[in-house]
UniProtKB/Swiss-Prot annotation:
One of its GO terms (biological process) is chromosome organization. It is found in: Nucleus, Nucleoplasm; Nucleus, Nucleolus; Nucleus; Cytoplasm. It comes from Hylobates lar. This is Myc proto-oncogene protein. It comes from the Eukaryota. The modification N6-acetyllysine is found at residues 143, 148, 157, 275, 317, 323, 371. Keywords: Acetylation, Activator, Chromosome, Cytoplasm, DNA-binding, Glycoprotein, Isopeptide bond, Nucleus, Phosphoprotein, Proto-oncogene, Transcription, Transcription regulation, Ubl conjugation. Transcription factor that binds DNA in a non-specific manner, yet also specifically recognizes the core sequence 5'-CAC[GA]TG-3'. Activates the transcription of growth-related genes. Binds to the VEGFA promoter, promoting VEGFA production and subsequent sprouting angiogenesis. Regulator of somatic reprogramming, controls self-renewal of embryonic stem cells. Functions with TAF6L to activate target gene expression through RNA polymerase II pause release. Residues 266-278 have a biased composition (Basic and acidic residues).
Length: 439
Protein backbone atom coordinates (compact mmCIF):
# COMPACT_ATOMS: atom_id res chain seq x y z
CA UNK A 1 0.00 0.00 0.00
CA UNK A 2 1.53 3.35 -0.89
CA UNK A 3 2.33 5.97 1.65
CA UNK A 4 3.16 9.60 0.99
CA UNK A 5 5.77 10.60 3.53
CA UNK A 6 7.79 13.79 3.47
CA UNK A 7 11.19 13.44 5.11
CA UNK A 8 13.53 16.15 6.33
CA UNK A 9 17.11 15.55 5.21
CA UNK A 10 19.24 15.53 8.34
CA UNK A 11 22.47 13.85 9.27
CA UNK A 12 22.43 11.06 11.86
CA UNK A 13 25.15 12.88 13.81
CA UNK A 14 22.64 15.61 14.63
CA UNK A 15 20.18 13.12 16.12
CA UNK A 16 22.02 13.37 19.42
CA UNK A 17 20.49 16.82 19.90
CA UNK A 18 17.01 15.33 19.94
CA UNK A 19 17.85 12.67 22.49
CA UNK A 20 20.31 14.69 24.56
CA UNK A 21 17.87 15.11 27.53
CA UNK A 22 17.89 11.32 27.91
CA UNK A 23 21.54 11.30 29.06
CA UNK A 24 23.27 12.58 32.17
CA UNK A 25 26.31 14.74 31.69
CA UNK A 26 29.07 15.55 34.13
CA UNK A 27 28.22 19.25 33.96
CA UNK A 28 24.72 18.73 35.39
CA UNK A 29 23.70 19.54 38.93
CA UNK A 30 25.51 17.56 41.61
CA UNK A 31 23.07 16.57 44.34
CA UNK A 32 25.87 15.71 46.75
CA UNK A 33 27.80 18.96 46.65
CA UNK A 34 27.51 19.31 50.42
CA UNK A 35 29.27 15.99 50.86
CA UNK A 36 32.10 17.08 48.57
CA UNK A 37 32.56 20.34 50.46
CA UNK A 38 32.71 18.73 53.91
CA UNK A 39 33.91 15.14 53.92
CA UNK A 40 33.41 14.89 57.68
CA UNK A 41 29.65 15.37 57.48
CA UNK A 42 27.92 12.28 56.02
CA UNK A 43 24.90 12.67 53.74
CA UNK A 44 21.37 12.34 55.00
CA UNK A 45 19.81 8.86 54.98
CA UNK A 46 17.30 9.97 52.38
CA UNK A 47 20.10 11.01 50.02
CA UNK A 48 21.73 7.59 50.35
CA UNK A 49 18.42 5.91 49.60
CA UNK A 50 17.74 7.98 46.47
CA UNK A 51 21.34 7.54 45.33
CA UNK A 52 20.93 3.77 45.63
CA UNK A 53 17.77 3.76 43.48
CA UNK A 54 19.03 6.26 40.89
CA UNK A 55 18.63 4.64 37.48
CA UNK A 56 19.29 5.89 34.01
CA UNK A 57 16.28 6.13 31.65
CA UNK A 58 15.68 3.75 28.80
CA UNK A 59 18.14 4.49 25.96
CA UNK A 60 16.69 5.85 22.70
CA UNK A 61 15.84 3.65 19.75
CA UNK A 62 18.47 2.72 17.23
CA UNK A 63 18.50 4.54 13.87
CA UNK A 64 16.42 3.06 11.11
CA UNK A 65 17.88 0.18 9.15
CA UNK A 66 16.81 1.89 5.96
CA UNK A 67 19.07 4.62 4.67
CA UNK A 68 16.15 6.74 3.52
CA UNK A 69 14.50 6.88 6.95
CA UNK A 70 15.70 9.22 9.63
CA UNK A 71 14.79 9.69 13.29
CA UNK A 72 11.05 9.57 14.05
CA UNK A 73 11.36 12.99 15.62
CA UNK A 74 11.82 14.55 12.19
CA UNK A 75 9.26 12.54 10.19
CA UNK A 76 6.20 14.45 8.98
CA UNK A 77 3.48 12.00 8.09
CA UNK A 78 0.89 12.78 5.45
CA UNK A 79 -2.46 11.09 4.81
CA UNK A 80 -2.75 7.83 2.96
CA UNK A 81 -3.33 7.88 -0.77
CA UNK A 82 -4.16 5.01 -3.08
CA UNK A 83 -1.74 3.79 -5.66
CA UNK A 84 -1.54 6.18 -8.54
CA UNK A 85 -2.63 9.29 -6.64
CA UNK A 86 -0.65 12.32 -7.78
CA UNK A 87 -1.63 14.69 -4.97
CA UNK A 88 1.34 13.91 -2.77
CA UNK A 89 4.91 13.05 -3.60
CA UNK A 90 6.85 10.02 -2.54
CA UNK A 91 6.79 6.43 -3.65
CA UNK A 92 5.05 3.31 -2.45
CA UNK A 93 6.22 1.31 0.58
CA UNK A 94 5.76 -2.33 1.46
CA UNK A 95 4.00 -3.64 4.55
CA UNK A 96 7.32 -4.23 6.35
CA UNK A 97 8.37 -0.62 5.73
CA UNK A 98 5.03 0.64 7.00
CA UNK A 99 5.29 -1.45 10.17
CA UNK A 100 8.84 -0.23 10.72
CA UNK A 101 7.74 3.40 10.43
CA UNK A 102 4.81 2.84 12.78
CA UNK A 103 7.12 1.09 15.24
CA UNK A 104 9.46 4.09 15.20
CA UNK A 105 6.54 6.46 15.69
CA UNK A 106 4.81 4.41 18.38
CA UNK A 107 7.86 2.78 19.92
CA UNK A 108 8.16 4.50 23.30
CA UNK A 109 5.69 4.83 26.11
CA UNK A 110 6.30 8.57 26.23
CA UNK A 111 5.41 8.99 22.55
CA UNK A 112 2.27 6.89 22.94
CA UNK A 113 1.11 8.98 25.85
CA UNK A 114 1.86 12.18 23.96
CA UNK A 115 -0.18 10.96 20.96
CA UNK A 116 -3.17 10.12 23.12
CA UNK A 117 -2.90 12.88 25.71
CA UNK A 118 -2.54 16.57 25.18
CA UNK A 119 0.79 17.82 26.61
CA UNK A 120 -0.92 20.95 27.96
CA UNK A 121 -3.70 19.00 29.67
CA UNK A 122 -3.71 18.43 33.43
CA UNK A 123 -3.94 14.69 32.89
CA UNK A 124 -0.55 14.69 31.16
CA UNK A 125 0.94 16.47 34.18
CA UNK A 126 -0.70 13.90 36.46
CA UNK A 127 0.93 11.19 34.34
CA UNK A 128 4.31 12.77 34.99
CA UNK A 129 3.64 13.02 38.72
CA UNK A 130 2.28 9.49 39.10
CA UNK A 131 5.43 7.89 37.71
CA UNK A 132 7.87 6.32 40.14
CA UNK A 133 10.80 8.29 41.46
CA UNK A 134 13.28 5.92 39.81
CA UNK A 135 12.27 7.09 36.30
CA UNK A 136 14.72 9.99 36.27
CA UNK A 137 14.76 12.26 33.24
CA UNK A 138 11.04 11.77 32.72
CA UNK A 139 10.07 15.44 32.73
CA UNK A 140 12.77 16.37 30.24
CA UNK A 141 11.66 13.63 27.86
CA UNK A 142 8.04 14.72 28.23
CA UNK A 143 9.00 18.30 27.39
CA UNK A 144 10.86 17.15 24.29
CA UNK A 145 7.96 14.98 23.16
CA UNK A 146 5.47 17.82 23.69
CA UNK A 147 7.59 20.13 21.52
CA UNK A 148 7.88 17.54 18.80
CA UNK A 149 4.15 16.86 19.03
CA UNK A 150 3.45 20.50 18.27
CA UNK A 151 5.65 20.27 15.17
CA UNK A 152 3.86 17.03 14.16
CA UNK A 153 0.46 18.66 14.43
CA UNK A 154 1.59 21.78 12.55
CA UNK A 155 3.08 19.69 9.74
CA UNK A 156 0.00 17.51 9.63
CA UNK A 157 -2.25 20.57 9.45
CA UNK A 158 -0.26 22.03 6.56
CA UNK A 159 0.06 18.78 4.61
CA UNK A 160 -3.47 17.41 5.11
CA UNK A 161 -6.11 17.84 2.44
CA UNK A 162 -9.75 18.76 3.30
CA UNK A 163 -11.14 16.64 0.49
CA UNK A 164 -13.78 14.30 2.02
CA UNK A 165 -13.82 12.01 -1.01
CA UNK A 166 -10.12 11.36 -0.55
CA UNK A 167 -10.70 10.50 3.11
CA UNK A 168 -13.41 8.04 2.10
CA UNK A 169 -11.08 6.38 -0.38
CA UNK A 170 -8.40 6.18 2.26
CA UNK A 171 -10.86 4.47 4.63
CA UNK A 172 -11.72 1.92 1.93
CA UNK A 173 -8.10 1.11 1.01
CA UNK A 174 -6.61 0.91 4.50
CA UNK A 175 -8.20 -2.37 5.65
CA UNK A 176 -5.16 -4.43 4.61
CA UNK A 177 -2.87 -2.03 6.47
CA UNK A 178 -5.04 -2.39 9.57
CA UNK A 179 -4.87 -6.19 9.42
CA UNK A 180 -1.07 -6.13 9.22
CA UNK A 181 -0.84 -3.59 12.03
CA UNK A 182 -3.29 -5.49 14.26
CA UNK A 183 -1.34 -8.72 13.65
CA UNK A 184 1.87 -6.96 14.68
CA UNK A 185 0.25 -5.25 17.65
CA UNK A 186 -1.17 -8.54 18.97
CA UNK A 187 2.37 -9.59 19.88
CA UNK A 188 2.92 -6.52 22.08
CA UNK A 189 3.23 -6.79 25.84
CA UNK A 190 0.33 -5.61 27.96
CA UNK A 191 1.50 -2.33 29.62
CA UNK A 192 -0.70 -3.07 32.67
CA UNK A 193 1.73 -5.86 33.61
CA UNK A 194 4.66 -3.41 33.68
CA UNK A 195 2.82 -0.40 35.12
CA UNK A 196 -0.39 -1.42 36.94
CA UNK A 197 -1.44 2.12 37.88
CA UNK A 198 -3.92 4.01 35.68
CA UNK A 199 -2.69 6.86 33.56
CA UNK A 200 -5.16 9.39 34.93
CA UNK A 201 -7.86 9.72 37.55
CA UNK A 202 -10.16 12.17 35.76
CA UNK A 203 -13.59 11.04 34.60
CA UNK A 204 -14.02 13.47 31.68
CA UNK A 205 -14.89 11.88 28.34
CA UNK A 206 -12.03 13.72 26.59
CA UNK A 207 -9.29 12.53 28.92
CA UNK A 208 -6.71 9.84 28.26
CA UNK A 209 -7.75 6.21 28.21
CA UNK A 210 -6.30 3.50 30.40
CA UNK A 211 -3.06 1.87 29.18
CA UNK A 212 -4.56 -1.59 28.92
CA UNK A 213 -7.47 -0.53 26.73
CA UNK A 214 -6.47 2.31 24.39
CA UNK A 215 -2.87 3.34 25.00
CA UNK A 216 -1.57 0.75 22.54
CA UNK A 217 -4.72 -0.02 20.57
CA UNK A 218 -5.06 1.54 17.11
CA UNK A 219 -8.43 3.11 17.89
CA UNK A 220 -9.39 6.25 16.01
CA UNK A 221 -12.05 7.27 18.56
CA UNK A 222 -9.55 7.79 21.38
CA UNK A 223 -7.21 9.73 19.10
CA UNK A 224 -10.09 11.81 17.81
CA UNK A 225 -11.13 12.72 21.35
CA UNK A 226 -7.55 13.66 22.22
CA UNK A 227 -7.22 15.88 19.14
CA UNK A 228 -10.52 17.57 19.98
CA UNK A 229 -9.36 18.31 23.54
CA UNK A 230 -6.01 19.68 22.35
CA UNK A 231 -5.97 23.42 21.61
CA UNK A 232 -3.35 22.90 18.92
CA UNK A 233 -5.45 20.53 16.85
CA UNK A 234 -7.10 21.88 13.72
CA UNK A 235 -10.87 21.56 13.16
CA UNK A 236 -10.37 19.61 9.96
CA UNK A 237 -12.48 16.58 9.03
CA UNK A 238 -11.36 13.10 10.02
CA UNK A 239 -8.40 12.17 7.81
CA UNK A 240 -6.52 8.97 8.63
CA UNK A 241 -2.78 9.41 9.10
CA UNK A 242 -0.06 6.87 9.67
CA UNK A 243 -0.30 6.98 13.45
CA UNK A 244 -4.13 6.71 13.35
CA UNK A 245 -5.03 3.64 11.23
CA UNK A 246 -8.72 2.86 10.89
CA UNK A 247 -10.42 0.24 13.01
CA UNK A 248 -12.83 -2.44 11.85
CA UNK A 249 -15.79 -3.96 13.60
CA UNK A 250 -13.85 -7.16 14.38
CA UNK A 251 -11.09 -5.25 16.18
CA UNK A 252 -13.59 -3.18 18.13
CA UNK A 253 -15.48 -6.34 19.09
CA UNK A 254 -12.25 -8.01 20.25
CA UNK A 255 -11.33 -4.95 22.33
CA UNK A 256 -14.83 -4.82 23.77
CA UNK A 257 -14.65 -8.52 24.64
CA UNK A 258 -11.28 -8.00 26.34
CA UNK A 259 -12.65 -5.09 28.35
CA UNK A 260 -15.75 -7.09 29.25
CA UNK A 261 -13.62 -10.02 30.40
CA UNK A 262 -11.52 -7.74 32.60
CA UNK A 263 -14.62 -6.06 33.98
CA UNK A 264 -16.26 -9.43 34.69
CA UNK A 265 -13.23 -10.62 36.65
CA UNK A 266 -13.01 -7.41 38.66
CA UNK A 267 -16.76 -7.34 39.33
CA UNK A 268 -16.76 -10.99 40.39
CA UNK A 269 -13.96 -10.32 42.86
CA UNK A 270 -15.56 -7.17 44.21
CA UNK A 271 -19.10 -8.52 44.42
CA UNK A 272 -18.13 -11.79 46.12
CA UNK A 273 -18.50 -10.34 49.67
CA UNK A 274 -21.83 -8.71 48.79
CA UNK A 275 -23.21 -11.97 47.37
CA UNK A 276 -22.02 -13.78 50.44
CA UNK A 277 -23.77 -11.25 52.69
CA UNK A 278 -26.98 -11.53 50.63
CA UNK A 279 -26.90 -15.31 50.89
CA UNK A 280 -26.23 -15.02 54.61
CA UNK A 281 -29.42 -12.96 55.16
CA UNK A 282 -32.35 -15.22 54.01
CA UNK A 283 -36.04 -14.41 54.09
CA UNK A 284 -38.04 -14.34 57.31
CA UNK A 285 -39.92 -17.57 56.55
CA UNK A 286 -36.91 -19.65 55.48
CA UNK A 287 -34.34 -21.41 57.57
CA UNK A 288 -30.92 -19.80 57.68
CA UNK A 289 -28.03 -22.03 56.71
CA UNK A 290 -24.83 -21.27 58.58
CA UNK A 291 -21.94 -20.17 56.33
CA UNK A 292 -19.43 -22.83 55.53
CA UNK A 293 -16.33 -22.23 57.60
CA UNK A 294 -12.96 -23.54 56.41
CA UNK A 295 -11.71 -26.72 58.01
CA UNK A 296 -9.11 -25.93 60.62
CA UNK A 297 -7.08 -28.80 62.02
CA UNK A 298 -6.22 -28.37 65.67
CA UNK A 299 -4.01 -30.50 67.79
CA UNK A 300 -5.53 -32.25 70.80
CA UNK A 301 -3.67 -32.18 74.06
CA UNK A 302 -3.58 -35.66 75.62
CA UNK A 303 -3.13 -35.55 79.37
CA UNK A 304 -0.68 -38.15 80.65
CA UNK A 305 -0.31 -38.80 84.37
CA UNK A 306 2.89 -40.56 85.39
CA UNK A 307 3.37 -42.22 88.71
CA UNK A 308 6.03 -40.74 90.97
CA UNK A 309 8.06 -43.76 92.02
CA UNK A 310 10.40 -41.62 94.13
CA UNK A 311 7.62 -40.76 96.59
CA UNK A 312 7.76 -42.47 100.00
CA UNK A 313 5.49 -45.49 100.45
CA UNK A 314 3.87 -43.92 103.51
CA UNK A 315 1.98 -41.44 101.29
CA UNK A 316 -0.02 -44.17 99.59
CA UNK A 317 -3.57 -45.02 100.58
CA UNK A 318 -4.95 -48.51 100.34
CA UNK A 319 -8.42 -48.23 98.89
CA UNK A 320 -10.93 -51.06 98.93
CA UNK A 321 -11.29 -53.10 95.77
CA UNK A 322 -14.71 -51.69 94.82
CA UNK A 323 -13.66 -48.10 95.47
CA UNK A 324 -10.43 -48.59 93.52
CA UNK A 325 -12.30 -49.93 90.50
CA UNK A 326 -14.70 -47.00 90.67
CA UNK A 327 -11.89 -44.45 90.81
CA UNK A 328 -10.13 -46.12 87.88
CA UNK A 329 -13.31 -46.00 85.80
CA UNK A 330 -13.83 -42.33 86.64
CA UNK A 331 -10.24 -41.58 85.67
CA UNK A 332 -10.63 -43.39 82.34
CA UNK A 333 -13.82 -41.46 81.60
CA UNK A 334 -12.05 -38.19 82.34
CA UNK A 335 -9.22 -39.07 80.00
CA UNK A 336 -11.68 -39.96 77.23
CA UNK A 337 -13.55 -36.68 77.68
CA UNK A 338 -10.30 -34.75 77.61
CA UNK A 339 -9.26 -36.50 74.42
CA UNK A 340 -12.56 -35.62 72.75
CA UNK A 341 -12.16 -31.95 73.52
CA UNK A 342 -9.89 -30.65 70.77
CA UNK A 343 -8.86 -27.19 71.78
CA UNK A 344 -5.77 -25.12 71.22
CA UNK A 345 -2.61 -26.43 72.92
CA UNK A 346 -2.18 -23.32 75.03
CA UNK A 347 -5.71 -23.35 76.45
CA UNK A 348 -5.58 -27.09 77.08
CA UNK A 349 -2.25 -26.70 78.87
CA UNK A 350 -3.62 -23.97 81.12
CA UNK A 351 -6.71 -26.04 81.92
CA UNK A 352 -4.61 -29.09 82.70
CA UNK A 353 -2.32 -27.05 84.93
CA UNK A 354 -5.27 -25.66 86.88
CA UNK A 355 -6.80 -29.10 87.30
CA UNK A 356 -3.48 -30.58 88.39
CA UNK A 357 -2.92 -27.77 90.89
CA UNK A 358 -6.39 -28.22 92.40
CA UNK A 359 -5.94 -31.97 92.53
CA UNK A 360 -2.61 -31.61 94.32
CA UNK A 361 -4.09 -29.29 96.95
CA UNK A 362 -6.99 -31.63 97.68
CA UNK A 363 -4.71 -34.66 97.77
CA UNK A 364 -2.41 -32.92 100.22
CA UNK A 365 -5.30 -32.06 102.51
CA UNK A 366 -6.56 -35.65 102.38
CA UNK A 367 -3.15 -37.05 103.27
CA UNK A 368 -2.75 -34.63 106.17
CA UNK A 369 -6.13 -35.60 107.61
CA UNK A 370 -5.31 -39.29 107.26
CA UNK A 371 -2.00 -38.79 109.03
CA UNK A 372 -3.67 -36.99 111.92
CA UNK A 373 -6.22 -39.81 112.30
CA UNK A 374 -3.45 -42.40 112.47
CA UNK A 375 -1.62 -40.34 115.07
CA UNK A 376 -4.82 -40.09 117.17
CA UNK A 377 -5.38 -43.85 116.93
CA UNK A 378 -1.79 -44.54 117.96
CA UNK A 379 -2.22 -42.36 121.04
CA UNK A 380 -5.24 -44.45 122.13
CA UNK A 381 -3.25 -47.72 122.09
CA UNK A 382 -1.32 -48.17 125.38
CA UNK A 383 1.45 -50.22 123.72
CA UNK A 384 2.11 -47.64 120.94
CA UNK A 385 1.35 -44.47 122.84
CA UNK A 386 4.97 -43.35 123.04
CA UNK A 387 6.15 -44.94 119.76
CA UNK A 388 6.25 -42.12 117.17
CA UNK A 389 7.82 -44.32 114.47
CA UNK A 390 5.18 -47.02 114.58
CA UNK A 391 4.07 -48.03 111.09
CA UNK A 392 0.48 -47.79 110.02
CA UNK A 393 0.06 -51.58 109.73
CA UNK A 394 1.22 -52.11 113.35
CA UNK A 395 -1.02 -49.30 114.49
CA UNK A 396 -3.99 -50.92 112.78
CA UNK A 397 -3.21 -54.41 114.19
CA UNK A 398 -2.63 -53.18 117.74
CA UNK A 399 -5.74 -51.07 117.53
CA UNK A 400 -7.77 -54.09 116.44
CA UNK A 401 -6.45 -56.20 119.33
CA UNK A 402 -7.00 -53.43 121.80
CA UNK A 403 -10.58 -52.94 120.60
CA UNK A 404 -11.29 -56.65 121.01
CA UNK A 405 -9.87 -56.66 124.54
CA UNK A 406 -11.86 -53.59 125.46
CA UNK A 407 -15.00 -55.19 124.09
CA UNK A 408 -14.33 -58.34 126.27
CA UNK A 409 -13.88 -56.20 129.33
CA UNK A 410 -17.07 -54.38 128.47
CA UNK A 411 -19.00 -57.62 128.34
CA UNK A 412 -17.56 -58.71 131.70
CA UNK A 413 -18.44 -55.42 133.29
CA UNK A 414 -21.94 -55.60 131.85
CA UNK A 415 -22.48 -59.07 133.32
CA UNK A 416 -21.16 -57.96 136.70
CA UNK A 417 -23.48 -54.99 136.59
CA UNK A 418 -26.44 -57.23 135.93
CA UNK A 419 -25.50 -59.48 138.85
CA UNK A 420 -25.13 -56.53 141.14
CA UNK A 421 -28.53 -55.19 140.07
CA UNK A 422 -30.17 -58.52 140.81
CA UNK A 423 -28.52 -58.73 144.21
CA UNK A 424 -29.64 -55.24 144.97
CA UNK A 425 -33.17 -56.19 144.13
CA UNK A 426 -32.91 -59.19 146.43
CA UNK A 427 -31.51 -57.16 149.27
CA UNK A 428 -34.15 -54.57 148.81
CA UNK A 429 -36.92 -57.18 148.97
CA UNK A 430 -35.44 -58.69 152.15
CA UNK A 431 -35.33 -55.27 153.79
CA UNK A 432 -39.02 -54.79 153.12
CA UNK A 433 -39.86 -58.08 154.79
CA UNK A 434 -37.88 -57.20 157.95
CA UNK A 435 -39.70 -53.83 158.26
CA UNK A 436 -43.08 -55.51 157.99
CA UNK A 437 -42.19 -58.08 160.67
CA UNK A 438 -41.00 -55.42 163.12
CA UNK A 439 -44.13 -53.39 162.78
Amino acid sequence: MPLNVSFTNRNYDLDYDSVQPYFYCDEEENFYQQQQQSELQPPAPSEDIWKKFELLPTPPLSPSRRSGLCSPSYVAVTPFSPRGDNDGGGGSFSTADQLEMVTELLGGDMVNQSFICDPDDETFIKNIIIQDCMWSGFSAAAKLVSEKLASYQAARKDSSSPNPARGHSVCSTSSLYLQDLSAAASECIDPSVVFPYPLNDSSSPKSCASPDSSAFSPSSDSLLSSTESSPQASPEPLVLHEETPPTTSSDSEEEQEDEEEIDVVSVEKRQAPSKRSESGSPSAGGHSKPPHSPLVLKRCHVSTHQHNYAAPPSTRKDYPAAKRVKLDSVRVLRQISNNRKCTSPRSSDTEENDKRRTHNVLERQRRNELKRSFFALRDQIPELENNEKAPKVVILKKATAYILSVQGEEQKLTSEKDLLRKRREQLKHKLEQLRNSCA
